[in-house]
């Protein structure tokens, strides 16, 4: 099987397979959409696998640094789990709602997208409420106001009325609650993105790139309350989201020859090795003496808020190698050892919210009970087990509901956080 067979499926536009000699004169038809979609069939487990992996890595990164932190990708390159999460979300959202737009029209697809945006917004508000209660309870019970300052809720305690309004407007967020607001904004833009990609996918990606460049050139950003800006700038991160959508709607298939090229493979490997060396200089300063000063001046700071181009290209290199060496039919995807990751990835909205709650609980235990390496490992592994258990319960409940006559969803990539529902 070629890489072209691994990345996407069939074409839905045009009249492929009709020989010129057999063709009959027909009346002119409206121009077919320019996008392609994978055929509906078996679920794309690679998406679930890496989305689940991203959820686990985000949880570990939200904890105080510990031994397991060294197993997260942010210590070995420029990008981290956030890039994986946003790309897959864009991919799955485009697949689910791109098909809905082609089959049911713009208005129906937009209505479904807005319904999902509302669900994510409600989840964010609910998580915000629970998270504030958790932090406030710990800070009060242990008479340690540093928790409120460290987690960024001091303004809420001083002006709860104003802060709640700002939180509802997505302008005020405690620490570790920046992903869902970003996703809500990106999903609100999805109808326009899909409508544009329906006819001009490459032009849509080019316009997204121009907006990304304009963000850096003109310092575009979303302001936050009480000051500053969003931790993830939607004007910049939309590029990764749109790129994921572009790949889902035929872009990955059109790139199959590039992905199959040995040149692409070796360039990706070389870039990842170079990025790994740069990250080593953060922990072994002596190695920085071997880096050209001009390169350091050009490279730093590697901005996460505006999705630095080094982070974006690092993710592209990782994705290129993943597609090449992890085919869709890889037997390991059926392994029981990977099942916990896949199940978590299939219920990403619920598991992400749970991970934010567990991360602060772990932070509190490490600060108030014990902070040794053994406790760090215990907290990290316990949190992952709880996330897996919750995902299993949700899966079990949905199976029971399906057997009771609920509507069964048969899609390659359930959008979940990205869109489904």
What is the predicted function of each stretch?
Residues 2-14, 18-421:
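Alpha-helical transmembrane segments and their immediate juxtamembrane cytosolic regions
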